[in-house]
Each structure stands twice: as structure tokens, then as C-alpha cells.
A protein has these predicted regions:
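Non-ligating segments of multi-cofactor redox enzymes
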Residues: 1-500
Length: 500
């Protein structure tokens, strides 16, 4: 057993209002420089829709993630020989048309235009070439709120298998927002795809980062990530990606997207996992077994034996206590109401989602008059949304989605009976039993999902870096290269012997 700690996130999709505040604050913080105009470390997609970049879930085209070949886990894009053959041209990479050509407007013409009978016009101008554009054609949220209708919705890879059942009436009854950041996976394919070894997963908290000095701009990480959350800076010729706001998380603060989230949909916490189980879990044959296999990697932070082994692995008590109070542990592992995004990619993602209940319940007419018995068949009869949610969150396993929706429905009915009344207690208890939950668990869920305070939603211990370096030696060191003390093994050797 090799215990590691992972900082993870859960997003409650029922609470997302699609305001894009998270996207704007993230961009103003991290990608407001030349070369990063098209980068959105955090973006909010309207579903059903193609997403950003277009049809990023089409792994047959982009060849992101992992696959099983002869029972062994292999990169879908091929191994080192394949990458060497395509080292100067990556055929699987998304193009500018899949993202978009970022633009601004000629505002100077509005301010300094001469007097005229006609109003001046601010023409769109490319932020890459600096030339005027005839018209913008796409953007990161171009299809927001199902804009584009019948032309855009069929581009969603998750919808294409359901085309026979879907008409335009479908979009009136089912629409959801899907906020996305880097998944900071336990088995990241972007890290394995990099020929330079520039991407790495931090040992202390599991955050996946890019070493800007080691990056050579081969861009295999871009197509290797099935979630398309690694970008190429055309100005610096380096890869960039979401870094989970590590300067903030090291200080015990939430990511900037979480801090500014209007709907308070995000929860951040620590989970403990057995790193030795990750490869076997990602190698299970049936993609629908990957969810349970990933759950099997997580460890119980309340187990005294696990605590002792975690301390032996260098995880201090503050992190163990944070894992015990973690909202991610409660929702993803204990209550099992949060699910991973596309587990079939075999990357073991660590940003999980509570599926939306509203599209299911809004389909029911006169919901207030519906007796408790009616909720169970209502959830079962909504096959199309359940299949759609399953294609995103459970590798197509509708039974997993059904269990989560039943538990969320039981919570809604139970809390309605407690706060408003009018619910038959016997039928309520039958629904709670069918959902395999309890009144105590439901009340805990309702508090965390509905009225949890800041400190309950974000349980983030400060960074564990006190033993990384010799701080006495570094005290007073100058940042100027020519004046700074020598570094490395030779310097440490000399310092220990009083030679410096």
C-alpha cells in the first residue's frame, strides 16, 4: 500500500446558473497574457451541445486518454514510436476551427472617428493576426443556453447515439450547465503523453502541473488529454493548463473559480488513496466497472491503520483531519452522489459532479400534487435524460445514475415533509428505503448541498513543504543568479561541513 493525498473537487450541477463568473475570474487571473487569448482553464458548457473545443468528447478523432490493448493499458494515441514518427506534426490535435480565433474590436475608431452622418463601427479584429475579420464564427460559449438549436445540439457526441429518440421538444425539457476545469487525474494521460516529461503530478497534493523550463512545445499533451484542458501558448511556445490555483490551495484557500462561484456549486477537499491500486483500477475490462474500481482506490481516513500508514508516508495530522472533514469524501465516497466525468477515458479524474435533478423533476407536471410513490417510476421513465447523464458521468451505466437520482429525490421529498409537510410518512419511508439511505444521512446531505458554510465547503489544509528544503541554508539567499549561494548536492555537502 502506497498512500497519497489528493486535493479534489465536486461540483453540484443543480446549483449552477450558467453565469460564467468562474470563467471570467479564472481568465483574468491566469490567462490574460498574449498567447493565452483562446485559453479557458475554466469554461461552462451548455448541454446538450458540442462543448469547447468542439466535440472534445470524440476520442476516436482526437485519440485522448487510455485504452486496453491485449489487457494492458496503452495510450489511445500510441506509444513512443508512434509519437516519434509524428514528432513534428501531431495529426490528432484540435485545430483553430475547433477552438476559435479570439478577437477584439476596433474601439479606437469609435473614439477618434471624424464627424460623419453615419455612426462609426467597431470592426472585429483578430487578436492573433491583428487583421480585421469579416465576422466571428465561434467562441467558447457560442452555443450558450442552447443557442443554435437544431444545428448545434446534434454536434454533441453524447446525443448522437440518441438521435432516434430526440426531437426539438427535448431541448425544452432538458438543459444543463457543465462547468469544466482540469481533472487532475490519478492516472493522467497528458503526463504520459509528453515526450519531454514536462508535465508532472505533484506528490504532496496530486495537482498536475507543467514545468515551463522542460516543455519543448511538442503539444502531444493537448491531444493526449481527453478533456482538452491543456493549451498551447503560441507566444511562449509552451504548454499551459489549469493549476488548481496552487498558490491559493497551498495557503489553505479555495481556487479562484470556487471563491467567486455565484451558485456556490463547488466543494474542495482532500481524499486519501492507494497509489498501488490505480493501475489495476484503470485496467478493468468493462468501462462501466471503472467507477467502482476508482472508488476502490480511496481509503477510509477514519481507519486507525490507514492513519498510521499515512503518517509513515509523510502525511501529517492536519491533512488526515482534513480528509476526515472533506466534503469530497462525503459526497463521492460515503454518500456516492457525485460521479466522475467520463470514467471510460481511464484517467481516473478527480473533479466529480452531482448530477442535476431538475431536468428529471421538471418533466413531471403538477409536481406538488404528486404522491411519493410517483417519484420512483418518474425517475425510471425518464430514460433519455438518464441515458444522456449516464453517457457523461457513468460510462453509459444508467443504474448508477438511477441510484443517485433516487437518493437526491428522497432528500427532496424528506426535507419537504419536514419543512412544509403534506407528505405521507409511510410513503416517505418507502422512498428512503428504495434510495438506500437514512433520515440522518439525508439531513447531512441537505445541509452540505444546501446551506453549508464556507469552511464546510472548502476544507483545504495548508501546503506540506516544511521538510522539502533546508530552510536554514536558504535564509538570506539572494534571487540574483550571480550572487545566490550555490545549489544542489555539492552545495549541501559543503554547507554540512562548514565550507560555506
Amino acid at each position: 500500500m502506497r498512500i497519497k493525498a489528493q486535493v479534489a473537487m465536486v461540483m453540484h450541477l443543480d446549483k449552477c446558473i450558467g453565469c460564467h463568473t468562474c470563467s471570467v475570474t479564472c481568465k483574468n487571473t491566469w490567462t490574460n497574457r498574449p498567447g493565452t487569448e483562446y485559453m479557458w482553464f475554466n469554461n461552462v458548457e451548455t448541454r446538450p451541445g458540442p462543448g469547447y473545443p468542439k466535440q472534445w468528447e470524440d476520442t476516436d478523432r482526437f485519440k485522448g486518454g487510455w485504452e486496453l490493448k491485449n489487457g494492458k493499458l496503452k495510450l489511445k494515441a500510441g506509444g513512443p514510436i508512434t509519437k516519434l514518427a509524428n514528432i513534428f506534426y501531431n495529426p490528432d490535435m484540435a485545430t483553430m476551427e475547433d477552438y476559435y480565433e479570439p478577437w477584439t474590436y476596433d474601439y479606437d475608431n469609435l473614439i477618434h472617428s471624424p464627424k460623419s452622418e453615419n455612426l462609426p463601427v467597431a470592426r472585429p479584429k483578430s487578436m492573433i493576426t491583428g487583421k480585421f475579420m469579416d465576422k466571428p464564427e465561434w467562441g467558447s460559449n457560442w452555443d450558450d443556453d442552447l443557442a443554435g438549436g437544431s444545428e448545434i445540439v446534434p454536434l454533441d457526441p453524447n446525443v448522437q447515439e440518441l438521435q432516434d429518440h430526440i426531437s426539438m421538444e427535448y431541448e425544452k425539457t432538458f438543459m444543463m450547465y457543465l462547468p469544466r476545469i482540469c481533472e487532475h487525474c490519478l492516472n493522467p494521460s497528458c503526463v504520459a503523453s509528453c515526450p519531454s516529461g514536462a508535465l508532472y503530478k505533484r506528490d504532496e497534493d496530486g495537482i498536475v502541473l507543467v514545468d515551463q523550463d522542460a516543455c519543448r512545445g511538442w503539444r502531444f499533451c493537448m491531444s493526449g488529454c481527453p478533456y482538452h484542458k491543456v493549451y498551447y501558448n503560441w507566444n511562449t511556445h509552451k504548454a499551459e493548463k489549469c493549476n488548481f490555483c496552487y498558490p491559493r490551495t497551498e495557503a489553505g484557500l479555495p481556487t479562484i473559480c470556487s471563491e467567486t462561484c455565484v451558485g456556490r456549486i463547488r466543494y474542495i477537499g482532500v481524499v486519501l488513496y492507494d497509489a498501488d491500486k490505480v493501475k489495476d483500477a484503470a485496467s478493468v475490462e468493462d468501462p462501466q466497472d471503472l467507477y467502482e474500481a476508482q472508488l476502490g482506490c480511496f481509503l477510509d481516513p477514519f481507519d486507525p491503520e490507514i492513519q498510521d500508514k499515512a503518517r509513515e508516508a509523510g502525511i501529517n495530522d492536519a491533512w488526515i483531519e482534513a480528509a476526515q472533514d472533506s466534503p469530497v469524501y462525503k459526497m463521492a465516497i460515503k454518500w456516492k452522489i457525485a460521479l466522475p466525468l467520463h470514467p471510460e477515458y481511464r484517467t481516473m479524474p478527480m473533479v466529480w459532479y452531482v448530477p442535476p435533478l431538475s431536468p428529471i423533476m421538471n418533466h413531471i407536471t403538477n409536481e406538488d400534487e404528486l404522491n411519493t410513490d410517483g417519484y420512483i417510476p418518474a425517475v425510471d421513465q425518464m430514460r433519455i435524460p438518464m441515458e444522456y447523464l449516464a453517457s457523461i458521468l457513468s460510462a453509459g451505466d444508467t443504474e448508477v445514475i438511477r441510484k443517485v437520482l433516487l437518493k437526491l429525490t428522497a432528500m427532496r421529498v424528506f426535507m419537504r415533509g419536514k419543512t412544509v409537510g403534506g407528505v405521507d410518512e409511510f410513503k416517505q419511508s418507502e422512498l428512503v428505503r428504495e434510495a438506500n439511505t437514512s433520515p440522518e444521512e439525508i439531513e447531512d446531505m441537505a445541509r452540505l448541498l444546501g446551506v453549508a458554510k464556507y469552511v464546510e465547503r472548502y476544507v483545504i489544509p495548508t501546503g506540506r513543504r516544511e521538510m522539502d528544503d533546508d530552510l536554514d541554508y536558504q535564509q538570506g539567499a539572494c534571487s540574483l543568479e550571480d550572487l545566490a549561494p550555490r545549489e544542489g548536492a555539492a552545495a549541501t555537502f559543503a554547507y554540512e561541513r562548514g565550507m560555506l
